[in-house]
Amino acid sequence: MEDTLKITAEDLKNYIERIEKLEQEKRDVQDHIRDVYAKAADEGWDIKVMKQIIRLRKMDDDDREEQEILLDTYKRALGMNYEGE
C-alpha cells in the first residue's frame, strides 16, 4: 500500500510540476505578445483594430461572414452611414 501511495504521490508531483512549468511558459508568451503590441503601438498601429483582426482570423470563414452580415444589418437598422451612401 505504501508503495502505491509513493508512486501515486510521485505521479501527482510530476503532473503539478509540469503544469507549473507550462504556466510559466504561458506567462512568458503573454509577455512576448505584450511586447509585440507595444512595439506595434509605438510604430503607430491601432492595437484595438489589430486585436479585432486577430479575433476575426481565428474564426472560420462562414462564421466570420455571418458576423459581418449581422454587423452590417445592425448598423443599417441604427441608421449608421456607409461609404457610398
From Swiss-Prot:
InterPro entries: GapR-like, GapR-like_DNA-bd
GO molecular function: DNA binding
Disulfide bonds: none
Pfam family, one: GapR_DNA-bd
NCBIfam families for the chain: PRK13694.1
Similarity section: Belongs to the UPF0335 family.
HAMAP family from the UniProt entry: UPF0335 (MF_00797)
Name this protein carries in UniProt: UPF0335 protein WP0746
Native organism: Wolbachia pipientis subsp. Culex pipiens (strain wPip)
